[in-house]
Amino acid sequence: MAATAAASVVRYAPEDHTLPKPWKGLIDDRTGYLYFWNPETNVTQYEKPTPSLPPKFSPAVSVSSSVQVQQTDAYAPPKDDDKYSRGSERVSRFSEGGRSGPPYSNGAANGVGDSAYGAASTRVPLPSSAPASELSPEAYSRRHEITVSGGQVPPPLMSFEATGFPPELLREVLSAGFSAPTPIQAQSWPIAMQGRDIVAIAKTGSGKTLGYLIPGFLHLQRIRNDSRMGPTILVLSPTRELATQIQEEAVKFGRSSRISCTCLYGGAPKGPQLRDLERGADIVVATPGRLNDILEMRRISLRQISYLVLDEADRMLDMGFEPQIRKIVKEIPTKRQTLMYTATWPKGVRKIAADLLVNPAQVNIGNVDELVANKSITQHIEVVAPMEKQRRLEQILRSQEPGSKVIIFCSTKRMCDQLTRNLTRQFGAAAIHGDKSQPERDNVLNQFRSGRTPVLVATDVAARGLDVKDIRAVVNYDFPNGVEDYVHRIGRTGRAGATGQAFTFFGDQDSKHASDLIKILEGANQRVPPQIREMATRGGGGMNKFSRWGPPSGGRGRGGDSGYGGRGSFASRDSRSSNGWGRERERSRSPERFNRAPPPSSTGSPPRSFHETMMMKHR
């Protein structure tokens, strides 16, 4: 599918005889960046290694006894390959392309051959994942703010060599470029592999998807059901975007294990989804609404489900899916393992966790009682007059580095569409919201992932469903209805260890959120603008005086047209009509006239940004 085409493809660089052995040069075809890889230590870096700094070799496997997981038959590969004998019948919505990344040697001393499951194999020799693996479990937990409760809980698995995963699965993980487990993976994997129920509370972008998928793959090795009689694993997610992305991860990392997965979501024809179920699927990823529809049609059986995952449980409850979730769970055997992942821990989520889980272990990453933003994201809060928002937005887009992907959030579908029309000509923007059909949404997301449309304008429907790893910036054109949605929106950037930027336009009508926003900013060590503090202090708006961005004006009237003001100059409010876009009074009287693309500038066009250049290239 097109989703996999957007993934990075890594190839070897031309041979460089000046590189010290065993270093090799690699090129990321997506970005064109050259970096260097040491196959002995699995270290990658952008700085060219020099002979004066020889690479550090590590023993094949060296695992601290404090984090060693006992290898039992529970994690061993099956003794026969009957489980996977129907490979040609398996459901796969993605092509069986080769894995990207450098190859791993087979047949070396203490190495691994190419034997499939069922044949004798040994564990993959892996390098040490220093410095994390050099820490004690207690120090690792303190560093990553991991707290656990629920009786005897095993220590975190701080390196991949400590997991005891099958070699084929480890190759998939390593070829994806991961050097060490994320904190949520390190702590949830050993608990899940014990067969215990889990409540995991962690921010978005923490690696939770693999946190439950990989133990699920191991579960499938032990529970060898006939997938034509029904799935063994069920993953419930709030949105179709998130559901399809979970399926993509399941197919990508389960390919070598011949694990089949299908996805059930609304907004698409039921026919292809029903045919996938008839062919058989080990894993079903579904939104609650569509799964309930298919259950009522009696076209799926959940009697074989023994591994249930509720991903973004808080979001599903916010969207009103609790009745559907409870109805689905009634169809699943009570003898099962249940894993719940959530970004927040409100009373509603606690209640459903108490009802559905049995003696769970709770894993917290960071402060659970307070809503906390990702500290890897630099947050910019700007008090902006409604008539100045688009001008400021264009400046932000022009300031981004070449290749940057940007998401802009609006409050309403109407605002989303209008802003997209205004930005398309210059920046290459596309809209995604609830009124778009599934083919339209898929096309927009594929264009965004590939970079052909580098600006995505979205309503909150995409705030928690979209997972694109290289988003550089998020712009809150409209402030959301609460700080929870604010945190989820900006969490689209700064994922998987990367940094990001979030720009938020804050107005007089948003002043009721000022106090809560200050807590979020201070909790993430971010600067709080004086105007926001003033709003919080007096409980009123901060735009009663002239601000840096323009004169006082009325609220944007969420869903109206007033949010699309004239293009006032960033430095001066006297130059608004210089390019034909500054007729604020005409715009307010007849907004329909301004839905067209802007006329050419009478004073000359500014230099093209990367986004404009990309649009010209692809026309």
UniProtKB/Swiss-Prot annotation:
Domain Helicase C-terminal, chain residue ranges per copy: 392-536
Example GO biological process: rRNA processing
Keywords: Acetylation, ATP-binding, Helicase, Hydrolase, Nonsense-mediated mRNA decay, Nucleotide-binding, Nucleus, Phosphoprotein, Ribosome biogenesis, RNA-binding, rRNA processing
Positions where Phosphoserine occurs in the chain: 136
Any one cellular-component term (Gene Ontology): nucleus
Swiss-Prot/TrEMBL catalytic activity: ATP + H2O = ADP + phosphate + H(+)
Region Disordered: start-end pairs: 47-139, 528-619
Residues that hold ATP according to the record: 202-209
UniProt family annotation: Belongs to the DEAD box helicase family. DDX5/DBP2 subfamily.
Function: ATP-dependent RNA helicase involved nonsense-mediated mRNA decay and ribosome biogenesis through rRNA processing.
Protein name (Swiss-Prot/TrEMBL): DEAD-box ATP-dependent RNA helicase 14
Protein species of origin: Arabidopsis thaliana
Gene: RH14
